[in-house]
Swiss-Prot record:
It comes from Histophilus somni (strain 2336) (Haemophilus somnus). Its EC number is 6.3.2.6. GO terms for biological process: 'de novo' IMP biosynthetic process. The lineage of its organism: Bacteria, Pseudomonadati, Pseudomonadota, Gammaproteobacteria, Pasteurellales. It catalyses: 5-amino-1-(5-phospho-D-ribosyl)imidazole-4-carboxylate + L-aspartate + ATP = (2S)-2-[5-amino-1-(5-phospho-beta-D-ribosyl)imidazole-4-carboxamido]succinate + ADP + phosphate + 2 H(+). The gene is purC. Keywords: ATP-binding, Ligase, Nucleotide-binding, Purine biosynthesis. CDD domains: SAICAR_synt_Sc. This is Phosphoribosylaminoimidazole-succinocarboxamide synthase.
Amino acid sequence: MTQLSLKKIYSGKVRDLYEIDDKRMLMVATDRLSAFDVILDDPIDRKGEILTQISNFWFKKLAHIMPNHFTGETVYDVLPQAEADLVKDRAVVCKRLTPIKIESIVRGYLTGSGLKDYKATGTICGLKLPEGLVEASKLPEPIFTPSSKAKVGDHDINISYEECEQLIGVELAKQVREKAISLYKEAAEYALTKGIIICDTKFEFGLDENGVLTLMDEVLTPDSSRFWSVETYQEGTNPPSFDKQFVRDWLEKSGWNKQAPAPKVPADVIQKTVDKYKEVLDLLTK
């Protein structure tokens, strides 16, 4: 990644944050790829640009549901032109918000950790589901299944709605659940018209200086969501997804112990992953 004249205040698995002032920051999506909570050595070319374009598309499309982290400024308002030219497709000027301390996950279909919980208990995060559901079953209604935010390198833990209320308060939990489900429903309905099923997704929320709940970070990207193709979807199977699954599958078969450092991923696996991210962008925005 290029060096910027702003002060870097945080480096996450994918995004770097730079301080502009006490109210604004610059969020830059890198080409880093993480799998199994380990950052891989090989970046995915243009991934940061594609993720930013997908996120920006959704932020604008869903802006009528709730406020988001945009300030309305561009990178050219806060960086010298030469630096702005380098990051213009992968950076956004954002409000500095106080993050809500939970991961806000909405599921419309049964798979992943939700399927494991359901098989064991008939519930997900304490929510009772109908009997007889199988892998990739569509749920009667989308459900809000929060998890606790883990430190970098640890795994998030699914929590019940009651635990969510204890963590962030009854009123805020209600607001977060309602907004998360509204965002998911509208996005899922739109994506379906483009041949994409949004199986599940994770939203990030924060509070602004006036305590207003605000959508932040990234929205409905292949990094934060599971996207399936309508064409290959079949209940009872594990449908292929538009994301880093190629890389995860290759790593699973490589015999790697899932501890850093990760093995070098072959170029063709990296390329297939880029193609999948690009396909999502094209399908959603054209």
